[in-house]
Regions:
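Canonical phosphoinositide-binding patch of PH/PH-like domains
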Residues: 45, 232-295
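Low-complexity, highly charged intrinsically disordered N-terminal segments
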Residues: 53-97, 108-110
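Long, charge-dense tracts
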Residues: 2-5, 9, 112, 353
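Extended, Lys/Arg-enriched charged tracts that mediate electrostatic binding to polyanionic substrates
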Residues: 184-194, 198-201
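Phosphoinositide-dependent membrane-docking surfaces
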Residues: 194-195, 202-222
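Alpha-helical transmembrane spans
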Residues: 82-180, 300-358
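Short aromatic-glycine-enriched beta-strand elements
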Residues: 224-230
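Short, non-transmembrane cytosolic segments of multipass membrane proteins
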Residues: 9-72
Length: 358
């Protein structure tokens, strides 16, 4: 039995929105254009629609190989949400091989064909017109051929070729990958109310969840304005926005729903948010288990869901529309009234051991 199979008791430091203790005011005031500070402790009870669609696919696929969700690669449970902070990680490693191969196949192949045509022309003393004609036919011809053959050859390289080449080094590579991922692994911990953000080389920025301010950050990219959840430590203004948890979204309401979901996850007076990734662990969280018992929630709702029908029906008409139409501006912050009620010197004595110095 693993630690994720055991029901838990929450620590005294766990986040409770109804019991936010006095906090010192921040010595620094943050005023940045393109950032919207979000209130803490008032909930809409929504889940991010687009993330939910992806998570349904992920959980249904993962269950086929790990029905107990005990694999270390499943990073969400009733105790903590794990994510990568500022790490390129496995996605880069998976991307760089096919990208390099396709680049070599197309650009390298065209250059080789062009060099070959020139070499043949010089060797046989062909006329410039003939050499140019051959180049005009063969170089674009190779480009078309390269694009046609790129997909099957890339699939073979990623599935068979790279596995054959790396097989003798499999254990070493897996060990190094695990170490790299672990070094960049951060977490929101529901049990003790702490946020631990990896800084690399075994270092972590750790602080209580209540010390983080949430902002909706505007991200200007080609094609328009997008949005992302950004966490800023209230006292030292350390910013965390390029994480595996906060992705860039086209709809602002998706980011607002993500912040709402995260708060309810951390708030131990609330049941776990009803999201796909947390479903296998709901019965292990005491508050959630009692909530589900009273409401009669189907314990396999997400895992047995017909996703396409859901997207055409309840998913769009209820989940998406609710987050889009919710009056987000009506929320009040339960944290703000507690600021300035205690000195920094007094507060430092109350912080958990291991928290980043302020």
């Amino acid at each position: 039995m693993t630690d994720t199979d055991v029901k838990i008791d929450f620590e005294s430091t766990a986040f409770r929105a109804v019991m936010i203790e006095p906090l010192p005011s921040s010595p620094k005031k943050r005023t940045w254009i393109g950032e919207e500070l979000q209130p803490m402790g008032t909930y809409a009870g929504v889940i991010p629609y687009y993330a939910t669609v992806q998570d349904v696919e992920a959980i249904q696929d993962h269950e086929k190989s790990d029905s107990g969700f005990s694999d270390k690669d499943w990073w969400w449970n009733h105790q903590r949400i794990r994510f990568l902070n500022g790490k390129i990680g496995l996605k880069f490693l998976i991307f760089v091989v096919p990208f390099t191969w396709i680049l070599t196949l197309v650009i390298g192949g065209m250059a080789t064909v062009g060099w070959g045509v020139l070499s043949v022309g010089r060797h046989y003393d062909l006329s410039g017109i003939l050499v140019g004609g051959l180049g005009f036919i063969l170089v674009p011809g190779w480009m078309l051929f390269a694009f046609w053959i790129a997909r099957p050859t890339t699939n073979w390289i990623m599935s068979t070729g790279i596995g054959f080449i790396l097989k003798p080094f499999e254990k070493t590579i897996n060990k190094r990958l695990d170490a790299t991922l672990e070094d960049g692994c951060s977490e929101f911990n529901r049990v003790d109310g702490q946020v631990r953000i990896a800084l690399g080389r075994g270092r972590y920025f750790e602080a209580p969840f209540v010390e983080f301010d949430a902002y909706v950050e505007r991200v200007v990219q080609h094609g328009g304005i997008f949005y992302r959840l950004m966490l800023v430590h209230h006292y030292i203004q350390k910013t965390f926005n390029k994480t595996g948890f906060s992705t860039i979204e086209s709809e602002k309401s998706e980011v607002l729903a993500l912040w709402d979901m995260l708060q309810r996850y951390m708030d131990v007076t609330q049941p776990l948010p009803d999201t796909p990734r947390l479903e296998p662990f709901r019965h292990l969280d005491p508050v959630t288990a009692e909530h589900d018992r009273k409401t009669g929630r189907n314990p396999r709702y997400w895992r047995d869901l017909d996703l396409e029908s859901w997207k055409d029906g309840e998913g769009w008409t209820e989940v998406h529309q609710r987050q889009s139409r919710f009056p987000w501006g009506s929320r009040t912050c339960k944290l703000t009234p507690q600021l300035g009620k205690i000195s920094m010197e007094e507060y430092r004595k109350l912080r958990p051991p291991g928290a980043w110095p302020i």
